[in-house]
Amino acid sequence: MAFFVLGRSSNAYIFGIFQEYKVHIINDISSKSEQVIVRCQSADNDLGEHYLNKGDDFHWHFRVNFFRSTLFFCHVKAGENEKIFNAFNVGYISSTCEDTSTCFWAVRDEGIFFSCDNENYSKAYQWA
């Protein structure tokens, strides 16, 4: 019982343990008729397959696990293009998005782009 109380103290939140994060996958393909298929999962959670029309946003929230090993990866298909990528990796993404605790991924014609504020995107993945 003492371990649980200490683990949930404010210091735990400072170090990112139990911190809540949000991840968004947005269909930003130029063609209005192009549907994007997204399936995201972690070792513990399969979030299922989602069909996104132009402008649609699939999102979820979660807390980083005690061991700070939380990882979500996504398989994205857009027409002939597809990519599997890490949508959240606690070792990298949490430090990149620690100010907002939110990660945005835009699926575009040129690849998959990343942002912490849904305004300033940079290309993260090339279609393969």
Label every PLM stretch briefly.
Residues 1-60, 64-67, 75-128:
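Intrinsically disordered, low-complexity segments enriched in small/polar residues
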